[in-house]
Amino acid sequence: GRQGFGYEVTSLKGHIAEILGLDKKHHMIIVGAGNIGRAVANYPSFGREGFQTVAIFDADPNKIGTDVAGLKVLAIDTMESFLDENPVDISVLALPVKSAQQVLNRLVEKGIKGIWNFAPTDLNYPDSVTVVNVHLSDSLQILSFKMLRAED
């Protein structure tokens, strides 16, 4: 910035978006159409930020074919063929612990490079894949700790 003038906000926002990789469109799939998967699919700002959900998969026959955020839930058995035909770089894992590692392995085999993991488990994956774990209980524990410190 220039002294007395500050920064040109539009230019600064553009540079920050570029640094964060938000100047590109990211196509993502969600694996798991339960509460967390539906919440992620319906989150309004992801699309504006360049994260476009292109498919949702589930293994539950009662969820397959239902509508979530304007997308029809697809059978998890069709995931690989979908990935063969559609460019996807991020997958959201919103599924039970028991199937998380197996699904991650299938995604890695199909070239997915980014995993946003909501399954409450740590996964094994190659260095070529970036995984961000979202453990909801960790966030609550941090909140509790910060509240306790604020009381001191």
Predicted regions and their residues:
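Hydrophobic, well-ordered beta-alpha structural blocks that scaffold small-molecule cofactor pockets
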Residues: 1-94, 99-110, 126-152
